[in-house]
Amino acid sequence: MKLWGGRFEKDTDREMRDFHASIHFDWRLYEEDIRGSIAHVTMLARQGIITNEEKEKIIGALTEILEEIKAGKVDFSPEAEDIHLNIETLLIKKIGDVGKKVHTGRSRNDQVALDTRLYVKKEGTAIIALIKELQETLINLAEGHLNTIMPGYTHLQRAQPVTLAHHLLAYFWMFDRDRSRFYDCLKRADRSPLGAGALAGTTLPLDREFVSELLGFNGVCENSLDAVSDRDYILEFLFAAATTMMHLSRFSEEIVLWNSKEFSFVEIDDRYATGSSMMPQKKNPDAAELIRGKTGRVYGNLMAVLTMMKGLPLAYNKDMQEDKEPLFDTVDTLKGSLRVFTGMLKTIKFNQGAMYKAALKGFLNATDLAEYLVEKGVPFREAHRITGELVLKAEKTGRELLELSLDELKEMSPLIEEDIYEKLKIENVLAKRKLFGGPAPQAVIEQLRQAREALA
């Protein structure tokens, strides 16, 4: 049943109909669409545009349709194009001409903007909860590894010692920014576009503020043209999702590396690993690899909508139909990735011995030797050179700095004393880094307190 055909003399070409239809993906908005229609007719009755009896009849039928869809009893039709017209068609079949009044004072342009705003608010709230669960997992793990020493890396080369707790909390703060971005995105999505009509509102005495309050919005869109043509709230949502996936991907990359025999820092639980169809010994980190791989599709979704929007004149254009599949796919991908990653992290085993052994190799205490010389009055650049030459000497003879004799150290600088051996022990090197935000256990305890506070 076509609800817009009055000015057309010819039927829509079948291929055009299928090409034009969006019901195969926008059916997911059925709940938001029905919520919006119930609020809309409630307002129409309050304004005297329809009767209370008509309102009750429409709301009763819409409620039935909602339950039928949830029960899987509705077959959506491409003939009705999209979720809006499918539901309206079902409504008219149930209650006849009264159902034709549901769209009074409304366009699909403001209707779809409403539906997607409600959807973004709902899914954004769910994603915020999933990010928070991941953050809580990171805090719990960090509390158990305050004294687990491991190498910190730059350029994937061992650099300076940190604790596993400090490393985990680095991701906590990344995800905290992600959570904040979603909150911020939802603030701007929290405006009702209903009443904007196709682009220029309507002559009917609608009460936009009343509908906005019924639907739980914080206000109404200020400009009718902007209300129907704005997709910033989707773009911001996609950007927040892409950034979150990027952080998940970075952590996943580390887990893939740490899980290898070359590192042996972690063992992934069997529930989050898979085997090889040919090599019986394999235990592959597929959960982490898939999250790393799926990040690209979320980036692609963001770029698709940015590119789609870049050349559109005001107001609504059919191009905007192409915003939904990237949005839906991003929601599914991000929620799935967060659930799987959190589950993997809750069950992962850290090899503290391997981490500690790695921290003892690779001259992670070299910076401390340079700073030891600085404290004795040596200019930093000179101290840097002296330490570099000592590293080279040790490296050529297969030793660490602590394995050089005091005489060998003094050859490079007579200022080096016996106390250097105690100062360069990895535990002492770490303990001295107690500045705010540093990796010393003392500093990390304070960081944990702040992390708990951030989640409160």
From Swiss-Prot:
A GO term for molecular function: argininosuccinate lyase activity
Give its localization.
Answer: Cytoplasm
Would you say which domain of life the source belongs to? Bacteria
Q: Would you kindly state one Gene Ontology biological process term found in this protein's UniProt entry? A: arginine biosynthetic process via ornithine
Family named by the database record: Belongs to the lyase 1 family. Argininosuccinate lyase subfamily.
Q: What is its main location?
A: cytoplasm
The record's listing under Pfam families reads: ASL_C2, Lyase_1
User: Which pathway does UniProt place it in?
Assistant: Amino-acid biosynthesis; L-arginine biosynthesis; L-arginine from L-ornithine and carbamoyl phosphate: step 3/3
| A GO-annotated cellular component | cytosol
Assigned keywords, A-Z:
Amino-acid biosynthesis, Arginine biosynthesis, Cytoplasm, Lyase
Q: Which reaction does it catalyse?
A: 2-(N(omega)-L-arginino)succinate = fumarate + L-arginine
- List the PROSITE patterns: FUMARATE_LYASES
InterPro entries with a match to the protein in the record: Arg_succ_lyase_C, Argininosuccinate_lyase, Fumarase/histidase_N, Fumarate_lyase_CS, Fumarate_lyase_fam, Fumarate_lyase_N, L-Aspartase-like
User: What name does the UniProt record give this protein?
Assistant: Argininosuccinate lyase
Q: Might you give the EC number(s) for this enzyme?
A: 4.3.2.1
